[in-house]
Amino acid sequence: MNEEIIIDVQGLNLWYGENHALHNVTLPIPNRKVTALIGPSGCGKSTLIRCFNRMNDLVSGCRVTGDILYHGQNINGTGADPVDLRRKIGMVFQKPNPFPKSIYENIAYGPRIHGIKNKRDLDEIVESCLHKAALWEEVKDRLHDSAMSLSGGQQQRLCIARTLAVNPEIILMDEPCSALDPIATSKIEDLIEELKKEYCVIIVTHSMSQASRVSDYTAFMYLGDLIEFGETRQIFENPHKELTENYITGRFG
């Protein structure tokens, strides 16, 4: 791989209590590309993506060994600040989760927490992030309406805009389209294509067609193991492992 590596996973193991959920995973994540994590339910893909911004810290009994290097620094090392990490590595969840506030306040909330108080600066951030999330034209005349009044697809794009507002480098997406209709899904996929021009995007998806459409690289996981990783075209057209081929062709899943 000739790409710049922004996250380098080295020998990662994770346990939930006695359950060994990830087994010695080693995976390079390239910057300004889309990497898809695929595999059947329970394979560890959501567990892995939550390691990247230490969301698993919040799970009782979770234990991790191995290294996750972000710009060469181990995110699990002593002195690493998980709050700062989650600003740099944002998360978009399966179900849209806007705050019960106005559209404007959903986006301004994060920058305010990080010390930005000037209204003109906040206005610029809100407009810029809504443009990047392809939502500005739809909401520019109702910024002070409740975010809960938006459609599901609009709410998910608002959540993406909210993530962008604190200036991350990496955007994690855990099945971001599973609760959306085909039209809303298409808009999110178009947005992902634009986002990778500025950000690293890592997406968990159950949809083989979505992974093949939106990603540059694909990692196939099964029962906590990373089975195969490579360029998406190679994974889908010429997988090196029989297990990968069986999953992609629908022989199991």
UniProtKB/Swiss-Prot annotation:
Annotated GO biological process: phosphate ion transmembrane transport
Reactions catalysed: phosphate(out) + ATP + H2O = ADP + 2 phosphate(in) + H(+)
Disulphide linkage map: none
InterPro entries for this protein: AAA+_ATPase (IPR003593), ABC_transporter-like_ATP-bd (IPR003439), ABC_transporter-like_CS (IPR017871), P-loop_NTPase (IPR027417), PstB-like (IPR005670)
ABC transporter domain mapped to chain residues: 7-248
Subunit structure: The complex is composed of two ATP-binding proteins (PstB), two transmembrane proteins (PstC and PstA) and a solute-binding protein (PstS).
Protein name, UniProt field: Phosphate import ATP-binding protein PstB
Native organism: Methanospirillum hungatei JF-1 (strain ATCC 27890 / DSM 864 / NBRC 100397 / JF-1)
Gene (UniProt): pstB
